[in-house]
Structures are given as structure tokens and as C-alpha cells.
């Protein structure tokens, strides 16, 4: 009741800050995993350049595993919360049980890919035998022990569905801390632990994920008393699975587009391993900045959706205004830091031969952060106002329809020696500006059809 009253009465600007800060911190924490691995790997005594390239090539598969796990979790979260609200305890238990059954299936697919598909995947992006070997080692470990990230994603959403999101954040923090502690120990070899190089980075990552998953499993079993826990509820129910993916599939697609974009960009940049590495390193820095916008978006959506349910035109308009304003405020420091201190990031990653490309990419692509952040906010606004199609179109424009053909065309001029690699980096700001203009048109249409008609 207090939560509902807060959503009704608290000034929107204060409410957005109060709801947004924990979500922003949570999203930023997710980005830490990728940056930490690359920073430690980049400072290996030997083979650091090849290892950084390998991490760049495996990243799309890591994102895809997260996409499927989170998308399944999102569908479970929404369906479970609705079912509990209806007081249907038996169905709630089936929803939770079926989500765990789906987790087992997802893990089985990842396991099979880890055993049989990794070599072909890595080899499609490079011919460097050292990079191929390191990429196979890293990705095989991440896939074979992927049950950690998969079940963490599911238990996180099961806890959020019952209002216990604090415990999922605790699990994230524990996993990040475990990863950060183990990275130098397992990569470089400290004490009785032998030097494992890129394999050590993979083991540190999956151990952190497993630690998070185990902790959230304990929280789920101990705290989610609204849900009956029994293996019998894991028996697959086609109706429930359809309901889960009716909600979760768009989230999987949105996340998977990021994975596809990075993979295709790696193919476009295949002519230059150093450019590939530079792009991969920059993408991880970019994720950290844009995840701030994603975190705020997760506050924008429920605030505007609640106001839309109340038919409160003023609170909807305030939600849009402050959502866009706060997003811009978050993006400005990100642009400033990446524009003025690219050398510091290059040193952190020990970028080596890719240093020049990395600094160039950072200075050019970071121009797009402002427009990218606004696009993310637009998507949160659309989703709150039943504009799922508009949100999907923006994702397609940003990560598929504009960026990949444009980068591909620019790469022809680069490979022919007519222009430098920097031309390819300009595809990103151009894409975000065009997408932002399209997003503004969508917002005007939604405002006219959904908001202005309210009394």
C-alpha cells in the first residue's frame, strides 16, 4: 500500500531518483564483470594482445547467453507477479518450477555449444591460431559452466517478482567481488594457484557467477514463502511456457540484437585484428556508460506505466520530461570522461598494438552517447505506454538496419586504402542520430494518440 501511494503521490522527479539509483548501480555492476576481465587479461606478461582479441570475439556469445537467461527471467517475473496478485498459489508454483525447467534446457544448449560449436564460431572471425586457441579455451569454460549465469538470471527475477530485489543486488555484489578477487590470482598465478592466463579469467568469471546463483537459490528457498517449492512443479507445462515467452521473447530479441551487432562488427573488422580488439575494448567501456541509461530506463517505465494506469496526464508528462533530462545528465559525464581520458583507459587495458585504434574509436563513438542514451529513454517511455513495436523498431535501427550496412560500406573504403579505420567508427554516431530522430517522431505520435486524449 505504501509503495502504491508513493507511486501516486511522490513528486515524479524525486520518485525517479529514488527508484533509479539502485537500478543504475545494479546495471553498472553488471558491466564491471567485462571491464575487470579485460583489464587483468590486458596486463598478462605474455600474449596479452591475442588474449584481448580473443575476449572480443567471445563476447557476443556471452551476451547471447545473458539475453536468453534474462529474457526468460523477465517473462517469469511478470507472469509470477501477476499470478501471485491473483492469489493463484498453485499456478505460481508451476510458473517458478517451469522457469527452472527452462533453465535446465538453456544450459543443455549452452553445454552442447561449448563442446561442439566453439571452434567453428571463433574460427569464423579470425585466422590467428593463438587467438583461436585462447578464444576456444575461454568460451568453452564459459559455456560448460554457464549454469551459474543462467540460474542467477532466473533466481534474480523470482526474487524481484516477490518484491525482494535487494537480495538479488546482494547476489550481484557477491559475484562481482568474487570475480575481482579471483581474476589476478587465477590469471597471473598467486600463492599455490598456478598461472592460467586467459583460462584463469574464464574460471574467475564463472566461479563468480556460480557464487551469485547459489546465494540467490538460498534466498529464493528461504524467503520466497509465497511460492511452494517442489520438484514436481518443474514438469513442463506448455501453456505456462508459452505465457513466459509471450512476455519474455521481445526482451530476448532486444538483448540478442546487441550480440548479433558485435559479432557482425567483428566480421567487418576481420581485416585488422587490432581494430577488432579496439572495438571490443571500447564496447565494454560503452556498456558501462550506457548501462546507466538502461538502469534509469528501468525506473522510467514503471513510473510512466503507473501514471498511465491512473490516467494522470501530468505525471506521464513529468515522467517523460524528467526521464529524458536525467538521462542527458547521466550521459554528459560519460562523454566527458571518454573524450578527455581515452589514454587512461588504453593504459588500464594495456591495449598495445590496438592502442591507437582504441583511442580513436573512443573519441569518435563516444559522441553518440548522448543520442544513444536518449534512444534508451525513448524505449522505456514507449514500453510504458504500450508501444512495444516502436521500442523494437528503435532497437532494430540502432543495432541492425542502419549500423551494420553503414559500417560494411565504410569498411570497403578502408580495405581499399582510401580511408583510415576511423571512418568505420563514424557509423555509430550517424546511426544514433538517425535513430534519435525516428524516436522523436514515434514519441510525438504516441503523445498524440495515448497522452493528449486523456482527460
Residue map of PLM features:
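N-terminal transmembrane alpha-helices
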Residues: 7-47, 60-75, 79, 104-111, ...
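Transmembrane alpha-helix boundary and packing residues in multipass membrane permease domains
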Residues: 23, 27, 39, 78, ...
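Small-residue hotspots at the loop-to-helix junctions and early N-terminal turns
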Residues: 49-60, 135, 139, 273-288, ...
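Small-residue-rich hydrophobic transmembrane alpha-helices
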Residues: 52-112, 149-168, 278-340, 372-386, ...
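Transmembrane helical elements of multi-pass membrane transporters/channels
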Residues: 18-37, 141, 175, 208-212, ...
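Helix-terminus/linker motif at the lipid-water interface of multi-pass membrane proteins
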Residues: 28, 32-53, 122-129, 185-196, ...
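Short runs within selected transmembrane alpha-helices of multi-pass transporters and secretion channels
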Residues: 73, 142-160, 168-176, 201-216, ...
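Short alpha-helical transmembrane segments in multi-pass integral membrane proteins
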Residues: 1-20, 80-147, 193-248, 304-368, ...
Amino acid at each position: 500500500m505504501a509503495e502504491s501511494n508513493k507511486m501516486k503521490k511522490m513528486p515524479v522527479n524525486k520518485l525517479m531518483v529514488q527508484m533509479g539509483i539502485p537500478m543504475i548501480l545494479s546495471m553498472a555492476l553488471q558491466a564491471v564483470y567485462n571491464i575487470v576481465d579485460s583489464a587483468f587479461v590486458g596486463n598478462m606478461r605474455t600474449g596479452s594482445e591475442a588474449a584481448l582479441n580473443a575476449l572480443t570475439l567471445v563476447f557476443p556469445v556471452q551476451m547471447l547467453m545473458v539475453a536468453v537467461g534474462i529474457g526468460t527471467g523477465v517473462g517469469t517475473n511478470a507472469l509470477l507477479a501477476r499470478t501471485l496478485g491473483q492469489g493463484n498459489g498453485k499456478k505460481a508454483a508451476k510458473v517458478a518450477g517451469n522457469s527452472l525447467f527452462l533453465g535446465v534446457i538453456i544450459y543443455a544448449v549452452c553445454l552442447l555449444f561449448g563442446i561442439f560449436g566453439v571452434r567453428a564460431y571463433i574460427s569464423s572471425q579470425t585466422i590467428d591460431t593463438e587467438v583461436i586457441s585462447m578464444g576456444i579455451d575461454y568460451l568453452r569454460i564459459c559455456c560448460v559452466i554457464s549454469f551459474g549465469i543462467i540460474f542467477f538470471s532466473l533466481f534474480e527475477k523470482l526474487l524481484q517478482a516477490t518484491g525482494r530485489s535487494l537480495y538479488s543486488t546482494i547476489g550481484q555484489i557477491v559475484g562481482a567481488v568474487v570475480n575481482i578477487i579471483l581474476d589476478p590470482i587465477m590469471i597471473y598465478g598467486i600463492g599455490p594457484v598456478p598461472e592460467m592466463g586467459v583460462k584463469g579469467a574464464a574460471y574467475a568469471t564463472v566461479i563468480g557467477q556460480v557464487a551469485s546463483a547459489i546465494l540467490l537459490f538460498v534466498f529464493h528457498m528461504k524467503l520466497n514463502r509465497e511460492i511452494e517449492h517442489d520438484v514436481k512443479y518443474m514438469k513442463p507445462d506448455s501453456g505456462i511456457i508459452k505465457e513466459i515467452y509471450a512476455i519474455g521473447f521481445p526482451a530476448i530479441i532486444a538483448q540478442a540484437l546487441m550480440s548479433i551487432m558485435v559479432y557482425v562488427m567483428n566480421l567487418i573488422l576481420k581485416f585488422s585484428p587490432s581494430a577488432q580488439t579496439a572495438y571490443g575494448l571500447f564496447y565494454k567501456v560503452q556498456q558501462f556508460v550506457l548501462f546507466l541509461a538502461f538502469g534509469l530506463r528501468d525506473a522510467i517505465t514503471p513510473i510512466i506505466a503507473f501514471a498511465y494506469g491512473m490516467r494522470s496526464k501530468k505525471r506521464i508528462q513529468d515522467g517523460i520530461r524528467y526521464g529524458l533530462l536525467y538521462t542527458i545528465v547521466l550521459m554528459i559525464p560519460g562523454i566527458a570522461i571518454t573524450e578527455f581520458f581515452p589514454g587512461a583507459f588504453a593504459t588500464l587495458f594495456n591495449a598495445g598494438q590496438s592502442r591507437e585504434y582504441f583511442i580513436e574509436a573512443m573519441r569518435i563513438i563516444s559522441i553518440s552517447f548522448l543520442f544513444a542514451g536518449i534512444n534508451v529513454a525513448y524505449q522505456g517511455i514507449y514500453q510504458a505506454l504500450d508501444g512495444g513495436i516502436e521500442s523494437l523498431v528503435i532497437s532494430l535501427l540502432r543495432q541492425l538496419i542502419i549500423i551494420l550496412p553503414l559500417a560494411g560500406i565504410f569498411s570497403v573504403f578502408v580495405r581499399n586504402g582510401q580511408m583510415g579505420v576511423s571512418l568505420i567508427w563514424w557509423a555509430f554516431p550517424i546511426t544514433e542520430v538517425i535513430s534519435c530522430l525516428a524516436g522523436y517522431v514515434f514519441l510525438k505520435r504516441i503523445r498524440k494518440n495515448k497522452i493528449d486524449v486523456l482527460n
